[in-house]
Design a protein with these regions (language model features):
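C-terminal catalytic "cap/lid" subdomain
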Residues: 2-317
Length: 317
């Protein structure tokens, strides 16, 4: 590969939906445009970028529409809904990134969104204990009614409302990582691993079959960073830094963490299971395989300053 460093940037599906009143595709595209502005700044700074994205709200919308229309059209299976979101969100990012590159006069960086599969174990215990939120936030009464009528599993999503939950097995391999590597060699800005990738398992004859599940975007992004030997894993989120005692008078923002410190905070239950914990876990897990590399958690608008060491929380081994 060329000497440019590789950054995997993992954008959450909720980052596309800024509020419960901003769920239209036009509103989501506006959010994508804002993120694209900050991602292209990394390109200008000399990074090669793979952008991954979540899809929790969006895949839930597809499934809900499918359930409403089930008497008229075939129901969309979960794995196909994940594929649908990879296409739709991938298009939004591909278009917005291309336009931002054009506006900045950067003509040597093509953009490509790649449908991506993620290998899982079909016997993963996650299938017996679904816990990955998808779809819109609801109040408890609405969620319980849908759980009763649709056979859903539901859970509180870090105090932000109730959501449907599905199985989220551990990602074992990003099937298309060799393709992503080749694209990076050609200086392509790649959009991949949408929604963590479409979960697939390997049959005895080597073929792949889809699984009814979703993959955690941060864990899949960490695995992709490992397979690409990336130099940085950057996870934009709703706050500029990681905090301890979040939401209390003792709240304290953290500029830096070592893996050991981060793991101790995870073990103590310091971070919310559905919010900051998966991001910190993903970076710590990646750094165990990537000594000397850097993980960063920050807000989208602070990404450039965070990479330069001026903002965000930097996690190192």
């Amino acid at each position: 590969m060329s000497q440019k460093k590789i950054a995997v940037v993992a954008v959450g599906g909720n980052a596309l939906i800024r509020s419960r009143d901003a769920v239209s595709l036009d509103a989501q595209y506006q959010a994508v445009k804002e993120t694209a502005h900050h991602v292209v700044a990394l390109i200008e700074a000399g990074w090669r970028v793979v952008l991954t994205h979540g899809n929790g709200p969006q895949v839930g919308f597809i499934l809900r529409r499918s359930e409403i229309a089930r008497d008229d059209v075939p129901v969309v299976p979960l794995e196909y809904a994940v594929g649908d979101t990879q296409g739709a969100i991938g298009f939004m990012f591909q278009n917005a990134l291309y336009n931002e590159l054009q506006r900045r006069g950067i003509s040597d960086t093509p953009v490509s969104a790649l449908v991506t599969q993620t290998l899982i174990d079909p016997n993963d215990p996650a299938f017996d204990a679904p816990d990955k939120p998808i779809g819109a936030h609801m109040d408890r009464e609405v969620a319980e009614k849908l759980a009763a009528s649709q056979g859903w599993k539901i859970a509180d999503d870090a105090g932000r409302g109730w959501r449907r939950v599905v199985a989220s097995p551990k990602p074992l391999q990003i099937i298309e990582s060799p393709v992503i590597r080749r694209l990076l060699e050609e200086n392509v800005l790649v959009v991949a691993c949408g929604g963590g990738g479409i979960p697939v398992y390997r049959n005895q004859d080597g073929t792949l079959s889809a699984a009814q599940a979703v993959i955690d975007k941060d864990r899949a992004s960490a695995l992709l960073a490992q397979e690409l030997n990336a130099d940085m894993l950057l996870i934009p989120t709703g706050v500029e830094q990681v905090a301890i005692d979040f939401g209390t008078p003792e709240q304290r923002w953290l500029d830096t963490l070592t893996c050991e410190q981060a793991q101790a905070l995870l073990d103590s239950g310091e971070f919310g299971a559905g919010s900051m914990a998966p991001k910190v876990e993903a970076i710590v897990g990646w750094l165990r395989h990537a000594p000397g590399k850097t993980g960063i958690i920050t807000s989208p608008e602070a990404m450039g300053d965070a990479v330069a060491g001026r903002k965000g929380t930097r996690i190192t081994d």
